[in-house]
Amino acid sequence: MAQNKPVKKIVLAYSGGLDTSVILTWLKDTYGCEVIAFTADIGQKEELSGLEEKGIKTGASKVYIQDLRLEFARDFIFPAIQGNAIYEMRYLLGTSLARPLIAKAMVEVAEKEGADAFAHGATGKGNDQVRFELGVKSLAPEKTIIAPWRIWSFGGRSDLIEYAKSKGIPVPVTAEKPYSMDRNLMHISYEGGILEDPYKEPDEKMFLLTTSPEKAPDAPEYLELDFEEGNCVAINGKKMNPLEIMETLNTIAGKHGVGRVDIVENRLVGIKSRGVYETPGGTILFLAHRDLESITIDRDTQHHKDKLSIEFAELIYNGHWFSSRMKAVRAFITETQRYVSGTVRIKLYKGICSVVGRKSQVSLYNPEMATFEKEELYNQKDAEGFINIYGLPAQETARLRKK
């Protein structure tokens, strides 16, 4: 439908790879309009080299490369950590968190440039098409969205290469990786290609952020993470901003082989997909933060938050970052973090991240109450009345059903 709708100026989510380079040219040919290429720097490092020059040569009227690393860490990764967001109990949502930020930044560029349409290179089988488009629909509902992979007749990579050569688009001369990869400040994800066999172990050469646990240092390393209201603010006593926290933890945890996960997940579109992830810094933050909550949040609130964390993760995974329900869930999470302040001691050793200590000035843990020795604060005789009342439904059900 978008193909038949006239547009004047398009903002394209651009990576500089084969797909988005072809899309850039295809958009100009198909719509006869100006195309602005947009790239978000969210920690992909060397992938940004030469991108502006390549975009202009491929036909973009302008190329925006925005450094969004601090915003990504502060406004997306850290709130996810506060909410203990983990999809299907395994995936820490590195890619899912990046997409709404990119959509938000593209909308801002579109408003500045007077663009009336957006385009992206996500395929019709994946989750990213949903995340990008829900972001745009939530922030700029009047804009047109163009998804070339759902429109054009190209069947795969060979068709794209043939089109690129016919249009003079530079085709990468390096050998194609036997899998797809997406990198940002939170993680690197690998999927497709040789990873589509869920029984086949990934090649060790694939991993870029983490050392093989077998080759990690033979001595453990200890870290102390300071938190204020659910956010990590210092490592080993040194104050840092969220970007510095992520970069530091990625380096240290990666050295010890921490943060690898190999899973088969359920995509929003109904397909099961194998993903291999490296999330070194995020793994440390997730474990440390959840542990600190255990001494700073009361039982009932914590149990409710644990249930809500599942919904929170699903909202992120499914692209609902800007929804009303997400705002309500985040408001609850923010309230629970008022007293999540303290220090967590972490031990890193050959792929394992262990919490070995925690303390807080506002801790709800009372050793005098918890002790198994004789104490005055807790009268064990009081437990009998509690059990009688608490167990009454079970007792009565059993008694009456025996009649």
UniProtKB/Swiss-Prot annotation:
What span is annotated as the signal peptide, if there is one? none
Q: What subcellular compartments does it reside in?
A: Cytoplasm
The top EC class, named as a word, is ligase
Residues annotated for ATP binding in this entry: A13, Y14, S15, G16, G17, L18, D19, T20, S21, A40, G121
Please report a single Pfam family linked to this protein: Arginosuc_synth
Binding of L-citrulline occurs at Y91, S96, N127, R131, S180, S189, E265, Y277
Q: Which GO terms describe its biological process?
A: argininosuccinate metabolic process; L-arginine biosynthetic process; urea cycle
- Any one GO MF annotation of this record: argininosuccinate synthase activity
PROSITE patterns referenced in this protein's UniProt entry, alphabetically: ARGININOSUCCIN_SYN_1, ARGININOSUCCIN_SYN_2
Which reaction is recorded as catalysed by this protein?
L-citrulline + L-aspartate + ATP = 2-(N(omega)-L-arginino)succinate + AMP + diphosphate + H(+)
Tell me the InterPro entries matching this sequence.
Answer: Arginosuc_syn_C, Arginosuc_syn_N, Arginosuc_synth, Arginosuc_synth_CS, Arginosuc_synth_type_1_subfam, AS_cat/multimer_dom_body, Rossmann-like_a/b/a_fold
What pathway does the annotation place this protein in? Amino-acid biosynthesis; L-arginine biosynthesis; L-arginine from L-ornithine and carbamoyl phosphate: step 2/3
Which keywords does this Swiss-Prot/TrEMBL entry list? Amino-acid biosynthesis, Arginine biosynthesis, ATP-binding, Cytoplasm, Ligase, Nucleotide-binding
Q: GO cellular-component terms in the record?
A: cytoplasm
The UniProt record lists the EC number as 6.3.4.5
Q: Which residues bind L-aspartate?
A: T123, N127, D128
Subunit annotation: Homotetramer.
Q: Which family does it belong to?
A: Belongs to the argininosuccinate synthase family. Type 1 subfamily.
Protein's name according to its UniProt entry? Argininosuccinate synthase
Q: Which organism is it from?
A: Leptospira interrogans serogroup Icterohaemorrhagiae serovar copenhageni (strain Fiocruz L1-130)
